[in-house]
């Protein structure tokens, strides 16, 4: 049952469902726990379909109402949702663990500080596009990971230079010794008087595709990740929107990269980030038929990544181990 049809029904207590969900959201914004719990319990007792919609509303509130005030809010609510459905069947008159789960989620959301600026940011991006101002590909997007960068002679070595593709802002301490070691391993290969050109057999079919506004999709992918690394939030949001309107395949790619970046680029800068981003990725599947909600999840995930301290030590350690194996230093 889609959201429009759901909102035409009445709750067990006689309230219009659409009005009930609107009231619930406003209660969360105001931090009115008792009213929020009362409304939610009425929805819960109405049907299992309403319980499912209730969780979607709570997840939406975690993203759009709480927002950046508590980046882990969605992960917390998602975890309670999993507990709700993994502990017992729907028994509205008995209450039980299902009721405990959403009541706890509501108490948490009502207690959180609120930062509901996501809608404003999405509107700003859309207004820019309507005015003919679209996302752009910066020069730093071209590196050894893509065709354009390899044609310019970029290598894994210059990727590690201070203004290379691996630059992160703000940078947390911890990665520098690993960067130094990897540069030592790569310099004899790609540096010096006779540097070896970098070759790659990897094929990215996005190389032959363009976004609705004419951006090469392979470079758009690269620009998206590197703009987040440099905490260029507005640029990253523009790129995310351009990718989103390019179709489901690009949307899926962005989510894959977001989860990877939470480990690869954020690392020990914010160890909880991978848990946050995994929850975002899982929750977006609940909104397969609701593009507006999926866009909101995507844009908020980008904002969280941009705001996190970044520490690429994990990726650098992996690179060291791989290169040592290639050099024969490891059996």
Task: Report each predicted region and the residues it spans.
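Metallocofactor- and cofactor-centric catalytic cores in central/energy metabolism, strongly enriched
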Residues: 31
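Noncatalytic carbohydrate-binding groove/subsite architecture in carbohydrate-active enzymes
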Residues: 231
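GIY-YIG nuclease catalytic motif and its immediate N-terminal context
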Residues: 1
């Amino acid at each position: 049952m889609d959201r429009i049809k759901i909102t035409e029904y009445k709750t067990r207590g006689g309230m219009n469902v659409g009005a009930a969900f609107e009231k619930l959201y406003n209660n969360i914004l105001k931090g009115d726990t008792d009213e929020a719990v009362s409304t939610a319990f009425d929805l819960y007792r109405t049907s299992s379909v309403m319980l499912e919609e209730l969780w979607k509303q709570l997840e939406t509130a975690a993203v759009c109402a709480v927002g950046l005030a508590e980046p882990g809010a969605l992960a917390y609510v998602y975890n309670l949702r999993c507990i709700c459905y993994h502990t017992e069947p729907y028994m509205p008159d008995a209450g039980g663990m299902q009721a405990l789960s959403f009541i706890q989620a509501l108490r948490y959301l009502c207690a959180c500080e609120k930062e509901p600026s996501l809608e404003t940011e999405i509107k700003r991006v859309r207004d820019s596009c309507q005015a003919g101002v679209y996302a752009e590909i910066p020069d730093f997007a071209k590196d050894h990971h893509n065709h354009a960068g390899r044609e310019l002679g970029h290598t894994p070595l210059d990727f590690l230079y201070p203004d290379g593709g691996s630059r992160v802002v703000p940078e947390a301490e911890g990665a520098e010794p690993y960067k130094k070691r990897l540069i030592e391993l790569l310099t004899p290969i790609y540096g010096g008087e006779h540097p070896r050109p970098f070759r790659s057999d990897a094929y990215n079919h996005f190389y032959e595709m363009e976004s609705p506004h004419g951006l090469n999709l392979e470079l758009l992918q690269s620009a998206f990740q590197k703009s987040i690394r440099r905490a260029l939030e507005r640029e990253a949001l523009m790129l995310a929107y351009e990718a989103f309107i390019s179709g489901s395949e690009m949307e899926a790619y962005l989510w894959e990269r977001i989860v990877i970046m939470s480990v690869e680029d954020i690392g020990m800068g914010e160890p909880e980030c991978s848990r946050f981003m995994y929850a975002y990725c899982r929750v977006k599947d609940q909104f397969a038929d609701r593009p507006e909600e999926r866009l909101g999840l995507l844009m908020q995930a980008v904002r969280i990544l941009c705001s996190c301290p970044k520490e690429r030590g994990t990726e650098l350690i992996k690179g060291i181990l791989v290169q040592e194996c290639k050099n024969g230093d490891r059996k």
